[in-house]
Amino acid sequence: MSPQTETKAGVGFKAGVKEYKLTYYTPEYETKDTDILAAFRVTPQPGVPPEERGAAVAAESSTGTWTTVWTDGLTSLDRYKGRCYHIEPVPGEEDQFIAYVAYPLDLFEEGSVTNMFTSIVGNVFGFKALRALRLEDLRIPVAYVKTFQGPPHGIQVERDKLNKYGRPLLECTIKPKLGLSAKNYGRAVYECLRGGLDFTKDDENVNSQPFMRWRDRFLFCAEAIYKSQAETGEIKGHYLNATAGTCEEMIKRAVFARELGVPIVMHDYLTGGFTANTSLSHYCRDNGLLLHIHRAMHAVIDRQKNHGMHFRVLAKALRMSGGDHIHSGTVVGKLEGERDITLGFVDLLRDDYIEKDRSRGIYFTQDWVSLPGVLPVASRGIHVWHMPALTEIFGDDSVLQFGGGTLGHPWGNAPGAVANRVALEACVKARNEGRDLAAEGGEIIREACKWSP
């Protein structure tokens, strides 16, 4: 019998409960390039020292349990355990601190966001010794990044497919999002695309309801796409939501979209789940479909400031799981601090290499190596007068989504689309000429109105 598995009755082991910090708090630990690093915002129960709570997070999200078990002797805890290696207070917050935890790469299945989250956040958030816990950021090592396909195509390939360069893309969600027949829905799609938008979009909760079954919607939207392409000479698309109750049904809808020859489908990646999302992403790459991602349900996870997960973590996970676009919100009208934080995770979506910058909420330097980038989608209550700020803040590699800002135009859908396209092209032209969009934005839009049909 192997010495490692041999039962030694005369030796035994020291059973019982012991403090987590004795095993899992290791301030002397030097992190490895292959470690997954996590930054947790911890709010402990009163009277619990930070070192113990940080170590508890590391233990309960890796190899630990509430008591010592004899099977600990059958493996190497030093190789597999998570380690809380640094603790720092949160400025301006009483009794909150950031616990930094390092996880050995062997704890995670290759290419599985599902397994990564199951390990890191699957159980520890219900730990009664903590009042609240929030995952602020993750550092994904290059060795783990390379096990993921990532976005089906990425920013450059999408631009090449669409033959559209040098400006943000324009998009509109069809409203009302529920209740339209498939034919009337397709009519609205045609009017918006014919007016000058690049894309229209299913709302996140449009799947296959009694008033509009998915196959009918796909057919009428495809007709609208082809008609608007023939009349404008531009490549158009509609985000056909393939989200369904089963993975098999989701793939069936994506297959039908491919057979129709449309360029893009859509998925609700949080409600649909990471396993389904990764499967759809792989299908889209293999079959030449772009993949738009909606983040429905994200606020359930990321809205609380001291519990849950920050959206930057969900954004990183999406880039690994796969998607060519994802909604990122917008910074127009928000506080400057929120602007910096939002643009921080926008850079995490688009760029290849992002330096640590705590002022923007980036706790770790992240190297994505060759993983394609994701286009952020700016949405939520924006309209044509926001165009100068959006053009300046988000730059060319973005999608600007005007729902009510298109369909709410007093002259109708097509004029609303025309207004957005004219405003965008005017702002891009002014920017390229060196004009100050922040100072002259209103004047630029008014000048464009004079020549708009």
Swiss-Prot record:
Positions with a binding annotation for Mg(2+): K201, D203, E204
Cellular localisation: Plastid, Chloroplast
Active site (record annotation): K175, H294
Quaternary context: Heterohexadecamer of 8 large chains and 8 small chains; disulfide-linked. The disulfide link is formed within the large subunit homodimers.
GO molecular function terms listed in the Swiss-Prot or TrEMBL record: magnesium ion binding; monooxygenase activity; ribulose-bisphosphate carboxylase activity
PANTHER family: RIBULOSE BISPHOSPHATE CARBOXYLASE, RIBULOSE BISPHOSPHATE CARBOXYLASE LARGE CHAIN
Protein name (record): Ribulose bisphosphate carboxylase large chain
Enzyme Commission number: 4.1.1.39
Site (Transition state stabilizer): K334
